[in-house]
């Protein structure tokens, strides 16, 4: 399975270097749950940024802007979808009213193909079970408690999700 990690600096106490150092430590500790890929999502100047690579966390150098207050991360052990294809790595990007969002998942979803068929969702080049969560939220056209609840009630399997939007709202399911 994978691992989720993150950092919230609501008061802006940490500088960019300190945030990068803390994230590097957190991500490296998460490697025991996955070394196939590592990714983070954060906001700066009202824009959502995603940095992900098919590499173990200790191989990456995180550069976080000083104004980023909320950062979510993911280390991956690939179960579906080749990690070398970066599109299969987390966090994923989605779109809803109000802007973009990032989603990362830990666990295994068993009904992703069934949900894609029954909900008329398009097939994508992303080869993971996790991406169905993005599609279900996008189907509702808004990122809020109701769409997250809908998504969580539809998927079957084991899961923990983190979702970050462009306004630095963070949801943990």
Predicted feature residues:
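Conserved short alpha-helical segments that host acidic/polar catalytic motifs at enzyme active sites
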Residues: 1-173
């Amino acid at each position: 399975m994978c691992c989720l990690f993150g950092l919230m600096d609501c008061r802006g106490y940490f500088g960019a270097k300190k945030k990068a150092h803390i994230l590097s430590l957190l991500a490296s500790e998460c490697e025991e749950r996955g070394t196939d890929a590592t990714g983070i999502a954060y906001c700066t100047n009202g824009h959502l940024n995603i940095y992900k690579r098919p590499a173990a966390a200790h191989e990456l150098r995180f550069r976080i802007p000083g104004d980023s207050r909320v950062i979510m991360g993911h280390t991956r052990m690939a179960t579906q979808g080749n990690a070398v294809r970066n599109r299969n790595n987390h966090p994923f990007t989605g779109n809803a009213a109000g802007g973009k969002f990032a989603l990362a998942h830990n666990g295994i979803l068993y009904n992703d193909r069934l949900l894609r068929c029954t909900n008329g969702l398009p097939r994508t080049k992303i080869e993971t079970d996790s991406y169905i969560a993005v599609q279900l939220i996008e189907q509702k056209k808004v990122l809020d408690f109701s769409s997250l609840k809908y998504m969580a009630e539809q998927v079957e399997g084991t899961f923990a999700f983190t979702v970050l939007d462009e306004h630095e709202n963070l949801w943990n399911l």
